[in-house]
Amino acid sequence: MHIYILGSAAGGGFPQWNCNCPNCHGVRTGTINAKVRTQSSIAISENGVDWILLNASPDIRQQLFDFKAAQPARKLRDTGITNVILMDSQLDHTTGLLTLREGCPMNVWCTEMVYQDLTTGFPVFNMLKHWNGGLQYHQIDPKQAFKINGFENLEFLPLIIQSAAPPYSPHRHDPHEGDNIALIIKDHKTQKQLFYAPGLGKIDDQIMQIMQDSDCVMIDGTLWTDDEMQQTGVGKKTGREMGHLYISGEGGSLSYLNQLSTPKKVLIHINNTNPILNENSAQFAELKANGVEVAFDGMQIEL
């Protein structure tokens, strides 16, 4: 399985266009050791030619420009992207579908709850239905594994997780099964497994066992502390209120990751306020010392 990190930041990217927090100001002026990052999305493939997007970020045009393998150039209009899987209906994971309209008809896999959001509050399916066949909806049963034509060795097993529907959703404060999923992706040829959960509000015993059984875990790294948005003065909500588990301290994701013998542990969906973006920070050093990597745009993993 080929895994390519198209974007590794949370909503707004890094630096966020209107933000002057220490991180955003520092990367903009070159005064901190940090990489510019686009909004989170990854691509996976079993042959290096045909690819599946996991989430479609607002930055998808630039991401695909930087990802040369996505353009095999076999004909006048071409792409290696044949399918999109949505983990949720968050704007930073779905607005890229509008940019992909020239590639319609496009196969889009999501749960019924996500489809409801994307036909009402943010009706992107409706908007594009007259655009050369539009978005072709494939329903994900959040309790059942599925396969995708053309990717015969890959099996996708959804996992219902605790997080939150987007602010525009009518059930933002009324959680439903299928609002958010993680994915266990198994490559039956290499016998390797990826666990992907860019939006993760809680780690329970089931998730711990799945992560232990995986060869690579790539999970939510939005915030270093639960009150980070408040402490930096850019927001009023805690991470948990937004559906994101913080990294540090008791009950943080790092305390769980440190219990795993999983070969590769990666944090993705990193907010612009998070000190781990500064590669000279104590927080970045702590992750490195514990064998946890910080995802960056262009990162490649082979399983």
UniProtKB/Swiss-Prot annotation:
One of its GO terms (biological process) is pyrroloquinoline quinone biosynthetic process. Pathway: Cofactor biosynthesis; pyrroloquinoline quinone biosynthesis. CDD domains: PQQB-like_MBL-fold. Keywords: PQQ biosynthesis, Transport. It holds the Pfam family Lactamase_B_2. The keyword Transport applies. InterPro entries: Metallo-B-lactamas, PQQ_synth_PqqB, RibonucZ/Hydroxyglut_hydro. It comes from the Bacteria. The keyword Transport applies. Belongs to the PqqB family. PANTHER family: COENZYME PQQ SYNTHESIS PROTEIN B (PTHR42663:SF7), HYDROLASE C777.06C-RELATED-RELATED (PTHR42663). May be involved in the transport of PQQ or its precursor to the periplasm. NCBIfam families: PQQ_syn_pqqB. This is Coenzyme PQQ synthesis protein B. The lineage of its organism: Bacteria, Pseudomonadati, Pseudomonadota, Gammaproteobacteria, Moraxellales.
